[in-house]
Amino acid sequence: MAESLMDIKRRIASTKKTGQITSAMQMVSGAKLSQIEKNSVAYQVYTDKIREIVTHLAASQLIDIARQKSSLQAEPADSTIKKAIKHEVTLSNLLVERPIKKTGYLVITSDRGLVGAYNSSILKAMVQMISETHQSPDEYAILAVGGTGADFFKARGMNLTYEYRGVSDVPSFEEVKQIIKTAVAMYDNGVYDELYVCYNHHVNSLTSGFRAEKMLPITDLDVSEVADQNLEYITEPSVDDALDAILPQYAESLIYGAMLDSKTAEHAASMAAMKSATDNANNLISELSIKYNRARQAQITTEITEIVGGAAALE
C-alpha cells in the first residue's frame, strides 16, 4: 500500500529531528575528543620523562642490581584476592618475572553505546585471545573498566574479578587512581602473575585498533634509547629507595596512559558514528522529499485529470 502524503511528511519531520540530535551529539563528541587529545599530549610529556628516568637506571645497571637482590629476597606470592590490598608495592614483584600461573587482563570499554564498533571490536578480540591462550577460567582474571565489558563477561560466565563503571569522559589521574592502584596491588599480591591492558588504540579520528600491552612485570625497557647519554648516578638515600618511588609511578603512568588512549578512541568512534547517522538522516530526507514531490505531482495530475474529465462530461 502506497504511503499517503501525510505519512511521508511525518517521516521527513521525524528524520529531521533525529538528524538534529545526532548532529548535536557529533559536535559534543568532537569537543570531548579535542579536550582529551590535549590532555593526552600534555600527559605524554610526563610519561616520556619518567620512562627516560627508569631507562637511565636500567642502562646504568641499577635496576639489574636491584633485580638480582630482589630475586634473592622475594617470597612466594599470596594468590588469594581476599588478602587486603597493600598500599606499598613490593619492588621485587614489579621487576622479577615469575612462573605464569594466572594472567590478568585489564579490559577498557565504554559505559554506553552509540560508539560504532568500538566495544564490539575489543570484546571480540578478547574472547578470541582468551580462548586461544587459556584452557580454563582459573588461568586468567578479568578486570573490566566500563559497563559494556563488565556486562558482556558476566553474561558469558567468564572470570570477572573486578569491575568499575562510570569513568568520566575526560578522566583525571585522581579519578582513576584507585583502579590503577588496585590492578597493580592485585599483581603484587599474586592474584595474577602478569598484567595486560587491553583497549582500542586511537590512531586518528577515523581509525583505531585493538591493543593488548603487557604492563607488569616491567620488562620492556630498551637501554639503547639512552645509550649515548651520561648515565652516572648518585642515589640518596639508596638505589632501592629511588626505585621504590619511581617504578610504581612508572607502572601506573603506563596504565593511565592506556586509559587516556582508550577514551580518545571512544570519543573518536562516537563522533564518527554520529556523523554517519547524521549523513544517513540527510540522505533519507532527500529520498523522502523526492518521494513526497512525486506523490504530490501524481496527486495534482490526478486532480487536473478529474477536473478536465468532469468539465468534458458537462458539455
UniProtKB/Swiss-Prot annotation:
Q: Which UniProt keywords apply?
A: ATP synthesis, Cell membrane, CF(1), Hydrogen ion transport, Ion transport, Membrane, Transport
Task: Spell out the CDD domains in the cross-references.
Answer: F1-ATPase_gamma
* UniProt GO molecular function: ATP binding; proton-transporting ATP synthase activity, rotational mechanism
Q: According to its record, how does it sit in the membrane?
A: Peripheral membrane protein
Q: Which GO terms describe its biological process?
A: proton motive force-driven plasma membrane ATP synthesis
Instruction: Point out the coiled-coil segments of this chain.
Output: none
Supply the Gene3D superfamilies for this chain.
Answer: 3.40.1380.10, ATP synthase, gamma subunit, helix hairpin domain
Subcellular locations according to the entry: Cell membrane
Provide a GO CC annotation, any one: plasma membrane
Looking up InterPro entries in the UniProt record yields:
ATP_synth_F1_ATPase_gsu, ATP_synth_F1_gsu, ATP_synth_F1_gsu_CS
User: Subunit comment for this entry?
Assistant: F-type ATPases have 2 components, CF(1) - the catalytic core - and CF(0) - the membrane proton channel. CF(1) has five subunits: alpha(3), beta(3), gamma(1), delta(1), epsilon(1). CF(0) has three main subunits: a, b and c.
**Family label:** Belongs to the ATPase gamma chain family.
The protein's job, in short, is: Produces ATP from ADP in the presence of a proton gradient across the membrane. The gamma chain is believed to be important in regulating ATPase activity and the flow of protons through the CF(0) complex.
Q: Under which name does UniProt file this protein?
A: ATP synthase gamma chain
